[in-house]
Amino acid sequence: MSKHYAAPEEILYHVGFSAQQLQGATVAVLPGDPGRVEPLAKALGSDASFIASHREYTSWLTKISDTPVLVCSTGMGGPSVAICLEELARMGIKKLIRFGTTGTIQEKVNLGDIIVDKAAVRLDGTSQHYAPLEFPAVASFEVTTALVLAAKNAGALYHLGIAASSDTFWPGQERYDSFTGYVPRRFRGTMQEWQALGVLNYEMETSALFVTSQALGLEAGAVCGVVVKRTQSESVAPPDVYQRAFGYMVQVTRGAVELLLQRMPINW
């Protein structure tokens, strides 16, 4: 398939910035929440600077190992992730790390722990627009290896496993604490099934990230902080739990980006 890159000065319609503004960056870190972009960019590297804010996409540039790295929010869910990836690919981004929050469904995983997802159950609709359901949602080996090595080096409490990516926060994740409490028949009992199969966590973006990246020829990985432990409660943990996870996630992500920027094979 031919690839269509943007002109250096072209402002891309959705993200609202140009390749020229990326200063040659080829690695992007992707939080979901636009409000987390600025603190993340400043925590990850040096000389952090604002690029643009348009729709759900807030973007900053930071420097890790003296190399420009993009930090860009994706909003919630697969559609906005795929749009972001399409436009970042046109501007020369090659490697991506999702930086998010998640709810675990396994007793062995605790609040504040880190999950590195190596694959995802495709409960979303977006990925089906890029590949049939038989096609696996798997992370880049290189990016995932970098994340695991960085987690080991940081001494983080991490788990490597599989996510279940749902288009919805309530029914698709079999949550009954919604406005009506209604969960369609097709989703009832599914959390127990995913638990039995060893799935670690529910979230809303990773399957779209992995499948879209593969379709576009990009390399992607995902690291998430655990803020809900659904074997105990449906409630999101207090902010201090996220802050603890955020600190480790920053160390892990920075370490992984440093490895990826070395442009050499990564060995276990």
Region locations from a protein language model:
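A C-terminal functional module that forms or caps the active site or interfaces directly
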Residues: 188-227, 232
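Active-site rim beta-loop-alpha module in soluble metabolic enzymes
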Residues: 138-198
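Generic non-transmembrane alpha-helical segments
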Residues: 146-154, 212, 252-263
